[in-house]
């Protein structure tokens, strides 16, 4: 697709926003390279991936992509036999960990919803657990190899620790015995050797090797002769340590080389998943949907919103093309929102053809176009003025040179910038030429000649942007089938231009033009009323559908709660009955034992009788557990709002929130649920009191963007704990599986306070200190329930 249209329609700005949602630099690079696909298969495949990512984000939260970075160059170095540094190995570890976690993330129970596109990608991932564990065991940080990397390294470092301890003991003794010759009663290290600061004039009093001197020459750093052998031994151990570290790094690098192909494959898949989830996150921010993609030149964008206009300012628009007409002529005054319409249609098509979900209603469709041309002006934003006539014409000439059979062409002020009569004639000729080649066109203009052309020409339709004459502002709603008008006389009158001047101006217009403008005004008014009625009807229908759906869901939940409560109560009662039987049997058994000893035979007979009575009573109670006692209690003959009543079928007290209807049904509240029941099914409670009816707030699910990381550095422990508590609540409601709490290393006070709080927090399943790439000891990784 031509780069000019991508720039003019501001697709690059969309990609800059999209990049913010990508984690890795390699995924950001894929965003930079994103352009519309040239076939419907790739378009639909990419849209389905984006839609699956959106659904996964809403159901499972963010994927575990942390730690992923572009290690392509590192893998190439390993493949060539190079030795990797600890920092490079940790980056490889980050990719290996992300691979394992990502595959685990996509594991699901058989009954759970499947996401075939992304699950297939995750299935190809090949975790390399042995290499991951070995790097994790061997590398501590970007510049430190762990003692556990090898037995040899462990032994060398243990010897080093012992030697250093011996040297420190000896040098402390030397410092104490020679303190009068020293600048300071301490020791230091020069060139990996322990030395003491001797005053220059006492050089001969402290025998040893001079390693350095101060800038003034007043102090000499001398290695006492008694430490030379010990220092030599330490130096030898340090050389052995370095050699062993080099061997460990070389061995790990070799294993990376042996697994390089798997690593490259995993990196490619993870990068692709990172890219796809960035599209899902952006779609979530836009409240976007997956449109249907047609290949017949027909599209139907419903409630389409420009993604770069602020949410509280954007006005949704409905645009159709290709079915009843192939050219849409949008007329009306300047600054009326015509350019916004063009840019919205063009940008939403480019987004959809690039695999991005679009901000529109769920019944929207776009069409596959090989080219989208936009003659709106290179530097013109939505608020800027129009280009010149020559600039327009140059762009039009370039557009007409293409094969336009599968093209969407957007013209802003077609024929503008020159004599109105000539401009209108040129505009009609251009439309005729492009239409004959099979192009789909949307053009804006304020020429009356083009309105008349659209009225008389087949497959060409008028449209206008609604204008509020009271506020002198456009509403930006598109009215298809109604040509626009300039509203010059109405605007002049509202601003204060004299009536005699306006009447004089009207006299200079032909009677036909005045009648035509009047007809347009009537059409606009009727169209506006019809659109408003349609919108109101849709709102009412949507509300009715939502209420019906909520009622059905609540009824279903109520049935489940009722059944569960009944079964639990029955099981509990059965346990009580069984326990009572067991106790009676135990007592009887004890009496039998006493009888064998000749004690209490009369008591046994009485106990047997009592046991039988108890058994009969318990069996009768057990039978009654299976019956619903719906007739218990006195029937209510009348009710009042807020009255308490007993509903036997639920075994629960409810509150009456409506009077009986013509079917004898009342609405009651049972907990958070509202249900309708027959008045005759309600029973009086011990005190059927009238309570003030409390309106329950409806629970609505909002997918809000909760960050998976909170930074507490700089806060005191009390403030940090307060923020973490609120953040964990938000993260739990946002369905995040794992979050990162950054508290820094410092003195450890803040970390201890946070950990103490996490131990008893209701939403916390597990927590641990961060690993490499997760913040180390300066961060805590929390797994939520």
Curated annotation (Swiss-Prot):
Keywords: ATP-binding, DNA-binding, Endonuclease, Hydrolase, Nuclease, Nucleotide-binding, RNA-binding, rRNA-binding. It holds the Pfam family MSSS. The gene is mutS2. Its EC number is 3.1.-.-, 3.6.4.-. Endonuclease that is involved in the suppression of homologous recombination and thus may have a key role in the control of bacterial genetic diversity. InterPro entries: DNA_mismatch_repair_MutS_C, DNA_mismatch_repair_MutS_core, DNA_mismatch_repair_MutS_sf, MSSS, MutS, MutS2, P-loop_NTPase, Smr_dom. ATP binds at residues 332-339. NCBIfam families: mutS2. It is an enzyme of class 3 (hydrolase). Residues 710-785 form the Smr domain. Gene3D superfamilies: 3.30.1370.110, P-loop containing nucleotide triphosphate hydrolases. One of its GO terms (molecular function) is endonuclease activity. GO terms for biological process: mismatch repair; negative regulation of DNA recombination; rescue of stalled ribosome. Homodimer. Binds to stalled ribosomes, contacting rRNA. Belongs to the DNA mismatch repair MutS family. MutS2 subfamily. This is Endonuclease MutS2.
